[in-house]
């Protein structure tokens, strides 16, 4: 996204440069050529300069102490597939980067792109000549001005790609370009599509229990506070959390995802111990999602509480992680922060927990 002064410097460098070439030297030479008319493919100069910098960046990609060009792997290995994604400026750069890689010989199906609230990157001639060479899905919403900003204020730009638009309610009008809002909406749509796929038998559900193997068995309860239960997005958060624990625990049983810890008559601790012993579990994991407005301000926070016990009542670890957000936007993103911290803490006490179930995205 456009998070820093340097990002906005890129955004505001709105001159267009000719687009062409099949390698980095050719890209630079082509862009430095004489100014062309609007019938020639041209792109935003700031975005183009940014992408050229990315293509020549040297990084230690394998943690072996050896720096190499960031995209050498995808250029050299035809089995490698990389999803390029970004918000705002990041989305524009991801799109242009994908086309550069295609121009260098990479099949477009190996570099799909998903953008959120991204501006256009080139003129109509560019969209016509190169639009089909990028496997692009653009996510926008009905109130976000950024995707149309270059067309509106400067002219001569055109969007392309498969377009999906979210329809925001009025209460989200202050967050129309916020990535947290896009994250919340995307997860809701993802779960709706996933439910259809599972119902049709196209996709198997993650099992509510996984018993094979020799690692310790963990009985899992996931719930939410009385205050959080009032929010319509909390079911998405709990499902997101459950899926993460299903991925990180080698052996587990999801006992309940509607745990009301505030109801002591139903959820007395002894009942957790009894149920876990019946299941043959070694550990009890209780996760609670809490969210509320602080009394002295209008800030909202999402709090993730994680507790682990042995089945005989011993406390293994108890921790809580919170993040300030809007009451109506950014809640899945805040939950992700809590999960990252909870996962690291869990690993300290339960060595069998898996930390590498997801490949970490690299920020360009």
Predicted feature locations:
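Serine hydrolase/lipase
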Residues: 23-29, 36-42, 48-85, 99-217
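Short secondary-structure boundary motifs at beta->alpha junctions and helix caps
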Residues: 309-363
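Gly/Ala-rich beta-loop-alpha elbow adjacent to hydrolase catalytic centers
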Residues: 86-90, 94
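Short, surface-exposed "cap/lid" segments of acyl-processing enzymes
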Residues: 1-31
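Short, surface-exposed coil-to-beta transition loops
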Residues: 299-304, 320
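A structural "domain/chain start" motif
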Residues: 120, 199-251, 352-364
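Short beta-strand->alpha-helix linker/helix-N-cap micro-motif
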Residues: 242-267
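A short, hydrophobic beta-strand-centered structural micro-motif
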Residues: 216-223, 269-295, 303
């Amino acid at each position: 996204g456009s998070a820093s002064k340097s990002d906005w410097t890129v955004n505001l460098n709105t001159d267009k440069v000719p687009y062409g070439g099949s390698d980095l030297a050719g890209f630079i030479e082509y862009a430095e050529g004489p100014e062309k008319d609007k019938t020639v493919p041209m792109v935003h100069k700031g975005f183009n300069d940014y992408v050229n910098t990315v293509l020549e960046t040297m990084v230690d990609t394998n943690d072996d102490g050896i720096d190499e060009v960031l995209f050498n792997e995808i250029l050299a290995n035809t089995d490698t597939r990389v999803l390029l994604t970004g918000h705002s400026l990041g989305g524009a750069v991801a799109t242009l980067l994908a086309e550069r890689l295609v121009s260098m010989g990479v099949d477009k199906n190996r570099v799909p792109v998903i953008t959120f609230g991204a501006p256009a990157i080139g003129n109509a001639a560019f969209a016509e000549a190169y639009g089909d060479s990028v496997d692009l899905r653009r996510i926008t919403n009905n109130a976000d001005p950024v995707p149309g900003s270059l067309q509106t204020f400067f002219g001569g730009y055109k969007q392309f790609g498969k377009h999906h638009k979210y329809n925001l309610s009025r209460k989200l009008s202050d967050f129309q370009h916020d990535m947290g809002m896009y994250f919340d909406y995307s997860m809701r749509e993802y779960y709706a599509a996933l439910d259809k796929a599972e119902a049709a038998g196209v996709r198997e559900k993650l099992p509510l229990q996984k018993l094979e193997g020799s690692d310790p068995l963990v009985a899992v309860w996931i719930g939410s506070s009385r205050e959080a239960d009032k929010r319509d997005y909390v079911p998405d958060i709990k499902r997101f959390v459950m899926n993460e624990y299903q991925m990180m625990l080698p052996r587990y049983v999801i006992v309940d995802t509607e745990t009301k810890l505030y109801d002591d008559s139903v959820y007395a601790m002894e009942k957790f111990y009894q149920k876990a012993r019946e299941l043959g579990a070694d550990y009890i994991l209780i996760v609670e999602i809490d969210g509320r407005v602080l009394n002295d301000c209008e800030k909202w926070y999402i709090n993730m509480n994680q507790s682990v016990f042995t089945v005989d009542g011993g406390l293994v670890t108890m921790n809580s992680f919170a993040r300030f957000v809007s009451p109506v936007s950014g809640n899945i993103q805040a939950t992700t922060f809590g999960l990252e911290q909870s996962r690291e803490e869990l690993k300290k006490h339960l060595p069998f927990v898996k930390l590498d179930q997801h490949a970490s995205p690299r920020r360009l």
